[in-house]
Regions:
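Extracytoplasmic
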Residues: 2-111, 346, 405-496
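Interfacial segments of transmembrane alpha-helices in multi-pass membrane proteins
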Residues: 87-139, 206-210, 491-537
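C-terminal transmembrane helical bundles of large multi-pass transporters
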Residues: 428-433, 438-573
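Extracytoplasmic/periplasmic
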Residues: 1, 298-374
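Hydrophobic transmembrane alpha-helices
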Residues: 101-105, 121-122, 138-159, 202, ...
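Signature of alpha-helical transmembrane segments and their immediate interfacial
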Residues: 236, 250-298, 307, 311
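Helix-loop junctions and hydrophobic alpha-helical segments within the transmembrane domains
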Residues: 168-195, 569-573
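Transmembrane alpha-helices and their membrane-interface boundaries in multi-pass membrane transporters
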Residues: 134, 151-161, 187-206, 211-252, ...
């Protein structure tokens, strides 16, 4: 008996066009359940707990019924990706520390020196997390890179300090004199290296993107903090440790390393034409690659194509039109403009028919669907009556859709009442309505073309003197966010070069040396961009930092070479 009732309800459900391609797809026998988050829980840690609990229940249901379950939606995708970023950040951090420890051990053959260096970067990492908390920032795709970045920049600081300490100790055989020489020689070098590296990342704070601003502030502050940690921690610790033994300074006389450096030196001075020629070829090759770079980002393009999150998103795109929210607001510019006549409804219906023809979109949901559903109900559920009411029919249906007095009819404005449902798509003055529609993740390159097509349709259907149409939603904000980040990259590189050039002029007081220092920093950026173009890596929020990292490392090496040159010039005349 229960099965027959259920079958009857299912048949009745499928006679309601309102739900077709919205909650079920008859062609693929797919049924969709929509879950909404309470606003108070959407941006809290409770979201992860709720989603995990939901997944457990659905997995049990899937096992018991042998039915395939697909989960997607913007809150779900963001939650899963955020959790993965936290886990991957931990592995990335541990991996960078482990590799750094192995490198230091192989290089210096000293456990105390290795532990001291790891302590410096560990303090830097703790400071980076503390800075994020103090500034009220959360772990995002970009800020998750800051702790490993601290390791990458902090370890060279330690290596240069230790290398100078070992070199000075070998010359003087006096620990105190070696520490003094280390601080006097490497202090200014490390200071300017960290200043320029901090500038390279801090300039992101000058952009309009909130995501890049957060990253710029935290990374800039913590890269400068690394200098003070290194300067205040390494010399005192070295003064308490035993002087380096012969084993610890043996790397200074490594014949293989010396042979390699001598070869590089010979090529630099004896084969200048070859060096410049190869560099020119690389630059030309890179410029061609730069022209191939695509500016395109997708919501889940950083996930493997075989990942369940990616597969489920594509399933929803095939069966439900996607999960990316798109909101269209239609304003009649007059109070009660939506109900004065059926003309606005006819225009909206024409526009929604256009939306149904767009392959990027799912089924639209708005005031028109509610009114057509109400008309069907008025005619005792006849599916052929699911259409926009005429003027006469609207006069009969309208009283049933008007907000009732909550005192005389407490059920009238409950969340499940028709009035409450319609109120979600119409404002209190009845002058504006919204259409909600899900769309596919078509990427930031195709989205402007799609929006231009939408704009042309709205101008053709709606008279701009009587209507104002606005297209918004997460799909549009995603595009704007991606564009802000990519534009911010160009701005940040410009400001980075300008500020770094000022630092170079202050440090060397020489325009030729300034030009000499900037050229080696432009070439790595060109090669980096060229490689991205040839390999097919798109310019997107998750890859823009590659340029800052390349600039930071190139500047670091350039300054160390030039400061060393400036220090040795008076001594060697």
């Amino acid at each position: 008996q229960n099965d027959s009732l259920l079958l009857a309800d299912a048949q009745k459900f499928e006679t309601l066009p309102f739900y077709k391609n919205l909650l079920y797809n008859k062609d693929s026998n797919a049924y969709i359940m929509a879950v909404s988050f309470i606003p108070d829980s959407i941006n809290t840690g409770a979201r992860t707990r709720i989603i995990r609990l939901l997944e457990e229940k659905l997995n049990v249901f899937s096992k018991n019924t042998n039915l395939a379950i697909h989960l997607s939606g913007l809150p779900y995708i963001r939650t899963i990706i955020a959790d993965r970023i936290k886990k991957e950040m931990l592995w990335f951090l541990v991996g960078s520390l482990l590799l750094s420890a192995i490198t230091l051990l192989l290089f210096f053959r000293s456990i105390p020196a290795t532990l001291m260096s790891l302590a410096v970067v560990a303090m830097g990492v703790i400071w980076s997390f503390g800075t994020m908390v103090l500034m009220g920032q959360k772990i995002t795709l970009l800020t998750a890179l800051i702790p490993p970045l601290v390791v990458v920049i902090g370890i060279p600081n330690c290596i240069y300090f230790l290398n100078k300490y070992h070199t000075a100790y070998k010359e003087t055989n006096d620990r105190s004199a070696a520490i003094i020489q280390m601080v006097s020689k490497m202090g200014i070098v490390t200071l300017f290296c960290n200043i320029t590296a901090a500038i390279g990342f801090f300039v992101f704070a000058l952009t309009k993107s909130p995501l890049l601003k957060e990253f710029g502030w935290v990374s800039g502050i913590n890269i400068m903090a690394l200098f003070f940690i290194s300067l205040f921690f390494i010399p005192p610790v070295l003064s308490y440790l035993k002087p380096p033994s012969q084993k610890h300074v043996k790397y200074l006389e490594n014949k293989y390393l010396t042979h390699l450096l001598v070869k590089i030196e010979r090529w630099t001075f004896n084969h200048t034409k070859w060096v410049f020629g190869i560099t020119l070829i690389l630059v030309v090759f890179s410029i061609v690659g730069v022209l191939k770079i695509k500016k395109e980002a997708f919501i889940v393009d950083d996930l493997p194509k075989k990942d369940k999150l990616y597969i489920d998103l594509k399933w929803f795109e095939q069966n439900a039109g996607g999960v990316m929210p798109l909101e269209i607001v239609i304003d009649t510019k007059k109070k009660n403009g939506l109900i004065r006549s059926t003309k606005p409804l006819d225009h909206i219906e024409t526009f929604q028919q256009f939306l149904l023809t767009q392959p990027e979109l799912g089924k639209p949901l708005g005031l028109i669907e509610g009114i057509k559903f109400a008309k069907q109900a008025f005619y005792d559920g006849d599916s052929s009556s699911y259409s926009v009411p005429s003027g006469t029919e609207m006069a009969f249906i309208a009283p049933y859709l008007k907000p009732a007095d909550g005192k005389t009819n407490p059920q009238a404005n409950t969340p499940k009442s028709p009035t409450a449902l319609l109120n979600k798509f119409i404002d209190t003055e009845k002058r504006a309505t919204r259409i909600s529609v899900n769309m596919k993740d078509i990427g930031s390159a195709q989205l402007p073309i799609f929006l231009k097509r939408m704009d042309s349709a709205t101008q053709a259907i709606f008279d701009t003197t009587n209507y104002h149409v606005q297209i918004t939603g997460s799909s549009v904000t995603f595009l704007e966010g991606s564009n802000f980040i990519i534009k911010g990259l160009g701005e940040s590189i410009f400001w980075a070069f300008l500020l770094i050039a000022i630092c170079m002029l202050f440090l060397f007081r020489s325009f030729p040396i300034l030009m000499c220092s900037l050229v080696p920093n432009v070439v790595p950026l060109l090669i980096t961009a060229g490689c991205m173009g040839w390999i097919g890596v798109s310019l997107k929020p998750s890859t823009v930092l590659v340029f800052s990292v390349a600039l930071g490392i190139a500047i670091d090496v350039t300054i160390r070479f030039l400061v060393n040159y400036k220090q040795e010039l008076p001594r060697l005349n």
